[in-house]
């Protein structure tokens, strides 16, 4: 901890290097999007079949996954609760009876000593999927709007609110890039994970902005760039330690939380790292870049006015 307190890293001086890293990650996301042919939407957004199957004895999800794959169905999701297993199939709704027979037969062959019973089947139509898609978009738009208004009000400038949302969008887009690279389906779990990442990311950003605001009042004679650098170095320990605790918990869920928590934890691991990166290497440098550009324009305007007055 003493090491972190004594460091004096020139974050702002190296801002273009960090902007380049962000740009490369965004290009990677675009490349993955093109290569995969877009986002791979799950049953929550496309519609399909939801089957609830109960076993006499508890079973492992991996064994159930193998049984479903052996029935010839590849696009599906699994979720379990005790002896009950839910199978979400992204398929044509007209073939529900065929899927029911195939899955039940395959599972019975896989678990001959564990009686299985189909508790129910639900059909999620395209209309429901479209509704959920709209709700997900509304959730993100509402979150962005609230963030802009809150940060702008707190720091008495809309610029700070806009920059904080730019950082959040940066985190979400790149997180989606890693989702695409891993060929994971976009479902409600991923939407929930991304909204959680938004919360952690904006929290880190507000902590840093608060310190910048305090130091701007205390260090009136200091250069703006120096104040930004000093503020980042001062909150560095807090940001790293807080994010590290979230990162460790997310890793625990990823490796030991089972299949249900795997996707959520995957997004949290990536999002936690990106949240720290965007706060320190994107948001703060953007504020500084805006101030530098504004001062340059102001000096040019004053110089031009002086020439005209002569």
UniProtKB/Swiss-Prot annotation:
Part of the Sec protein translocase complex. Interacts with the SecYEG preprotein conducting channel. SecDF uses the proton motive force (PMF) to complete protein translocation after the ATP-dependent function of SecA. It comes from Endomicrobium trichonymphae. One of its GO terms (molecular function) is protein-transporting ATPase activity. Keywords: Cell inner membrane, Cell membrane, Membrane, Protein transport, Translocation, Transmembrane, Transmembrane helix, Transport. Gene3D superfamilies: Multidrug efflux transporter AcrB transmembrane domain (1.20.1640.10). This is Protein translocase subunit SecF. It is found in: Cell inner membrane. The chain crosses the membrane at residues 18-38, 135-155, 162-182, 188-208, 240-260, 267-287. Forms a complex with SecD. Part of the essential Sec protein translocation apparatus which comprises SecA, SecYEG and auxiliary proteins SecDF. Other proteins may also be involved. Its main location: membrane. Coiled coil: none annotated. GO terms for cellular component: plasma membrane. GO terms for biological process: intracellular protein transmembrane transport; protein targeting; protein transport by the Sec complex. Belongs to the SecD/SecF family. SecF subfamily. It is a multi-pass membrane protein. Pfam families: Sec_GG, SecD_SecF_C. PANTHER family: PROTEIN TRANSLOCASE SUBUNIT SECF, PROTEIN-EXPORT MEMBRANE PROTEIN SEC. HAMAP family: SecF_B. The keyword Protein transport applies. SUPFAM superfamilies: Multidrug efflux transporter AcrB transmembrane domain (SSF82866).
């Amino acid at each position: 901890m003493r090491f972190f307190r004594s460091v004096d890293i020139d974050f702002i001086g190296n801002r273009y290097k960090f902007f380049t890293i962000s740009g490369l990650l965004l290009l990677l996301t675009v490349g993955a999007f093109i290569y995969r042919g877009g986002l791979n939407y799950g049953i929550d957004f496309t519609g399909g079949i939801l089957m609830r199957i109960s076993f006499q004895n508890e079973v492992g999800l991996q064994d159930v996954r193998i049984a479903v794959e052996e029935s010839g169905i590849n696009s599906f999701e699994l979720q379990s609760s005790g002896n009950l297993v839910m199978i979400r199939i992204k398929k044509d709704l007209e073939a529900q009876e065929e899927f029911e027979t195939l899955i039940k037969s395959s599972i019975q062959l896989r678990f001959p000593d564990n009686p299985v019973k189909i508790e129910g089947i639900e059909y999620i139509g395209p209309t429901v999927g479209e509704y959920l898609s709209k709700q997900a978009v509304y959730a993100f738009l509402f979150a962005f709007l609230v963030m802009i208004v809150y940060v702008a009000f707190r720091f008495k400038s809309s610029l700070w609110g806009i920059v904080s949302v730019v950082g959040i969008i940066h985190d979400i887009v790149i997180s989606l890039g890693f989702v695409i690279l891993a060929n994971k389906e976009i479902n409600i779990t991923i939407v929930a994970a991304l909204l959680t990442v938004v919360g952690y990311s904006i929290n880190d950003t507000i902590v840093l902005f608060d310190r910048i605001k305090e130091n701007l009042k205390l260090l009136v004679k200091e250069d703006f760039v120096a104040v930004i650098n000093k503020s980042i170095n001062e909150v560095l320990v807090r940001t790293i330690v807080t994010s590290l605790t979230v990162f460790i918990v997310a890793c625990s869920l990823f490796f030991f939380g089972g299949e249900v928590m795997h996707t959520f934890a995957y997004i949290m691991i990536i999002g936690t790292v990106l949240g720290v990166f965007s706060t320190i290497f994107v948001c703060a440098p953007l504020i500084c870049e805006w101030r530098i550009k504004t001062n340059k324009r102001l000096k040019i305007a004053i110089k031009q006015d002086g020439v005209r007055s002569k």
